[in-house]
């Protein structure tokens, strides 16, 4: 349901978005479009003015959220199954690149805590792998990824207001992992 918050009334309803349990939404820089990441692996681009689905794709078997680059050109989905992230062109939802979360040979992790950083970068946690990864999409089809140890089961993450530090709560132990992204 789309709501006009100034008038406090619903103005449209958009269906066909898949499994929305634990879904998340990010918005284009001009706030015209919303990108909905569904639990069923669906990624939907919505036109909020036209109240319609522009495009919907099934990009994984089980997704948990996503983010959009600071310039608004890249939408990234974080996935449980298969573990990893996928980057898409924000206009067309064309797949640009995939970064599998293979933390050891043949071992893949659920990805959680995805957050956008300056310079077309994204930070995220590998729940099963105990790591934080930082992927640079300055060349969207050839991302470069750095890996950092994080502790047991890093989970939800966020970036500090100055954009410098990425923090991930540790589900498997008492504590918080902090990565200086500069």
Short names for language-model regions:
Residues 1-182:
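Predominantly soluble domains enriched in secretory-pathway, periplasmic, or organellar proteins
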